[in-house]
Amino acid sequence: MKWVTFVSLLFLFSSAYFRGVLRRDTHKSEIAHRFNDLGEKHFKGLVLVAFSQYLQQCPFEDHVKLVNEVTEFAKKCAADESAENCDKSLHTLFGDKLCTVATLRATYGELADCCEKQEPERNECFLTHKDDHPNLPKLKPEPDAQCAAFQEDPDKFLGKYLYEVARRHPYFYGPELLFHAEEYKADFTECCPADDKAGCLIPKLDALKERILLSSAKERLKCSSFQKFGERAFKAWSVARLSQKFPKADFAEVSKIVTDLTKVHKECCHGDLLECADDRADLTKYICEHQDSISGKLKACCDKPLLQKSHCIAEVKEDDLPSDLPALAADFAEDKEICKHYKDAKDVFLGTFLYEYSRRHPDYSVSLLLRIAKTYEATLEKCCAEADPPACYATVFDQFTPLVEEPKSLVKKNCDLFEEVGEYDFQNALIVRYTKKAPQVSTPTLVEIGRTLGKVGSRCCKLPESERLPCSENHLALALNRLCVLHEKTPVSEKITKCCTDSLAERRPCFSALELDEGYIPKEFKAETFTFHADICTLPEDEKQIKKQSALAELVKHKPKATKEQLKTVLGNFSAFVAKCCGAEDKEACFAEEGPKLVASSQLALA
């Protein structure tokens, strides 16, 4: 890369940065501005989501009352921006409203102390009390009752959906949840007139639930990235991913989008859902206006209404690679001026490297690309301090080979196992693996993570070879972030804390490198942990699996050094026991009689 070109890139990058950072014209009333930009429907939906994410235990009706009060106030300010209190910040207005809840102290305890603080400390305090694992009942489809409620009052029905999802997922991407609510509405509009409401609705709602869980996990990873590793880490992640998606866009264009996208997600992660949704709409507009220079895959997205358009752009497939991309070595391993470029503008030079490398490798995961960039940076730090830097960094690309081979080998090994045993037994293998790595972690968390990791096999192992690695490692990043978030709430393992906090890019290799925790004192064998009753027979299949997998994790905690064959024997005996007693005429009597025998045989098998 010639130096004049690099200077131009630096100038463009800086311009793009400042275009993204400078806010639009200031308004007398922020709340009036957002109300006018978003419209009443989306404004109310986003305020409901924001309040539900902060106060996760409050009844729906209480939130509706707060939302209506805020909306009426916004209308007043939209009519007259100079009216009383209309010049207050959104944090001040929303925080004041949350602090009027009469049951705040009784329901939330320490969260009520936040109300004694001033902004911005008050909002930061509210954020720290968001609960990623709230104690809320499972939501089960009830097609007849739900259709009756939908037909009676569609707006209330959809509001209840926003509320229920938001309070279970306190970092859900606000504007994206509005999109999913539209999907939810479409499912009920289609299925409620059907003769077989359940047959029509349940598969659709199950599929929507999977999309919701995936969307929630993606945004939680973004928010964790900000919280634990800062804005620079999020920008690096975004440069890598967007360069893969938009390989025809130049670096300045990718940089501008990354800067704006960073602002959008920072706002949503910070609870600023109105600003986030408004800025996302602006970014969507910009991308569609400049689609010719960004990606040939955007046209179908840009013809859609706003919520669908933004969702479509976020999920758009990678564009075709330009056919004339030169080899990277000339600019990043052979150029004698590399150290000068690097020292003059480190972040821009490294960003350019990450962009160029990522756009050529849609077959790599984002975290692998970040590990490569990190290795490149470390090499330049070392070589640029030596007597002959060009000779030192000339072979830097050779250092990337083991970084690439390690995850490729891991994906092949795991996909081979998945194809051999199927999803359920693959989950079991992962539950055993992770229980041995971190036996101190709670059994429900280990089972949840093992099941999620196991589903990655179903999602990724059937894909073409070129897509397996990015699919697997990108989804593993989501599952491991969930483990880190839950572990942070109740930390029990220094090894897990280290993997979670050292480096976002190195998380997966760190977890893969964990072995049997030799310092762990095995859990005492308790018969009641392995005692079951007839109610297991009527459970849905997934809940039945969770019961069995919980027993498996407990067995490993009791006997961490149990062999694969020992565990297979015990699990096989357990499955046979459940099948036998669920088929018996007197199920409870069978469980009472056969259960102690199972416990005894399990202890013997593990001895």
From Swiss-Prot:
Role: Binds water, Ca(2+), Na(+), K(+), fatty acids, hormones, bilirubin and drugs. Its main function is the regulation of the colloidal osmotic pressure of blood. Major zinc transporter in plasma, typically binds about 80% of all plasma zinc. Major calcium and magnesium transporter in plasma, binds approximately 45% of circulating calcium and magnesium in plasma. Potentially has more than two calcium-binding sites and might additionally bind calcium in a non-specific manner.
Sequence positions that bind Cu cation: 27
SUPFAM superfamilies attached to this UniProt entry: Serum albumin-like (SSF48552)
Record localization: Secreted
Sites of N6-succinyllysine modification: 228, 587
Tissue note: Plasma.
Any one GO molecular-function label of the UniProt entry: enterobactin binding
Organism: Equus asinus (Donkey)
Protein name: Albumin
Subunit structure: Interacts with FCGRT; this interaction regulates ALB homeostasis. Interacts with TASOR. In plasma, occurs in a covalently-linked complex with chromophore-bound alpha-1-microglobulin; this interaction does not prevent fatty acid binding to ALB.
N6-methyllysine PTM positions: 557
A Pfam cross-reference name: Serum_albumin
One GO process term, biological-process aspect: cellular response to starvation
Positions of Zn(2+) binding: 91, 270, 272
Post-translational modification: Phosphorylated by FAM20C in the extracellular medium.
Major localisation: secreted
